[in-house]
Amino acid sequence: MGTRNRKLLFFLHYQRYLGLTNLDFSKSLHIYWLHGTWSSTAIQIVVVGVFMAALLGALAESLYYMETKSQTGNTFDNAVILTTSVTQLLANLWLRSQQKSQVNLLQRLSQVVELLQFEPYAVPQFRWLYRIWLLVCLIYGAMVTHFGINWLTTMQISRVLTLIGFVYRCVLANFQFTCYTGMVVILKKLLQVQVKQLEHLVSTTTISMAGVAGCLRTHDEILLLGQRELIAVYGGVILFLFIYQVMQCILIFYISNLEGFHSSNDLVLIFCWLAPMLFYLILPLVVNDIHNQANKTAKMLTKVPRTGTGLDRMIEKFLLKNLRQKPILTAYGFFALDKSTLFKLFTAIFTYMVILVQFKEMENSTKSINKF
C-alpha cells in the first residue's frame, strides 16, 4: 500500500457512494484502497434491500411493463422484470467480491502509468463517459416519471418496488458499464504510448536492446492486466449486465412490432427507451481496440533490420508468442468483448424477437380456432 498512485478515473471511486464496493482514493496518500465505513456498508445494504424487495414484489404478482395482448409477450415481459433484480444483484455481488482484485489492478496500472509518463487527466473521453452516464440517468428519470404515472394507477406496493428496482438498475448498471469502458480506454491509451516509445527506440541508428526489452515487457504487462486482472474484476459483471440488456432490447423490439404501437408518440417513446439500452450494450464492444493496438507492436518489430545479435532472438521470440493471440477481453470467456461480437449480438436480438412474434401468431391462431 506504500506505492503512490495517480487517480486513473476521477469517477471510479464513486462506486462506494452507489453501494457497489468500498473502493476509495486517498488524497493524502495518493493511493486506491478499500475504506469500509458504516455509511458505505449502510448504502450497500440499502441497495441489496431495494433489489430483493423488487424481486419479491415481482414474484408476488405476475407483473409486466406493458400489455402486449398475448400470453407470450406478457410472460416474457414478466421474465424481464424478474431478471432486472436477479442480474443486477449478481453483478453487484461479483464486483463486491472482486474489490481487492480491483485495488490490485489499479495499483499495477498506476505503476505502468508512471513508467510511461501517461497523464489520464489529459484524456477527454473519461469526462464524456461520465457526462453521458449523467445524461442517461436524467433521461431515464424523465421516462420513468412519464411511465410511472400510467403504470402506478393503483399504487400497488409490488409495482412501486419493481419500478424503484428498475431505476436503481439503470443507474448502477450504466455506471458499471462506464467504469469498465474507462478501464479499457486506459489500457488502449497505454498501449498507444508504448508503441510510440518503441517506434522511437527502433528508429535510432543504434538500437538499445535493453530499451526494447523493457518496452516489450511493458507491452506484455498491459495485455496481462487486461486478459487476467480486468476480466477477473469486470468479466462476470459485464456478462450479467448483458443478459438483462439483451432481454430488454428484445422486449422493446417486440413491443414496437405490435399493433397499436405505431403512432409518432409511441415511436418516440420506444426510441427513448431503446437508445440508452443499445448504447451501453454496444459501448463496451466498440471501445475495445486493444487487439489492433497490440498488433502495431508486432508489425513494427517485423520491420526492424536483423543484426545477428540477441536482439533478433528476442524479437523472434516475441513475435512467435503473439502469433496466435486469443481475444484479449472477454465476458469471463463466454464471448469476446470487441467489435466481432456486434453482428452476433444483433442477430441474437432479432432472432429471439422473431421467435416471440411467431409464438404470438401461433397463440392468436389457436384462439381463432377455439372460437369456432
UniProtKB/Swiss-Prot annotation:
It holds the Pfam family 7tm_7. It is found in: Cell membrane. Keywords: Cell membrane, Membrane, Receptor, Transducer, Transmembrane, Transmembrane helix. Expressed in the adult labellar chemosensory neurons. In larvae, is expressed in neurons of the terminal external chemosensory organ, as well as in the dorsal and posterior pharyngeal sense organs. Residues 54-59, 144-147, 246-265, 369 are extracellular. Residues 1-32, 81-122, 169-224, 287-348 are cytoplasmic. The chain crosses the membrane at residues 33-53, 60-80, 123-143, 148-168, 225-245, 266-286, 349-368. It is a multi-pass membrane protein. One of its GO terms (molecular function) is taste receptor activity. Disruption phenotype: Leads to reduced courtship levels toward females. Gustatory receptor which mediates acceptance or avoidance behavior, depending on its substrates. Plays a role in sustaining courtship behavior in males, possibly through the reception of a stimulating arrestant pheromone. Belongs to the insect chemoreceptor superfamily. Gustatory receptor (GR) family. Gr21a subfamily. This is Gustatory and pheromone receptor 39a, isoform B. It comes from Drosophila melanogaster (Fruit fly). The lineage of its organism: Eukaryota, Metazoa, Ecdysozoa, Arthropoda, Hexapoda. The gene is Gr39a.
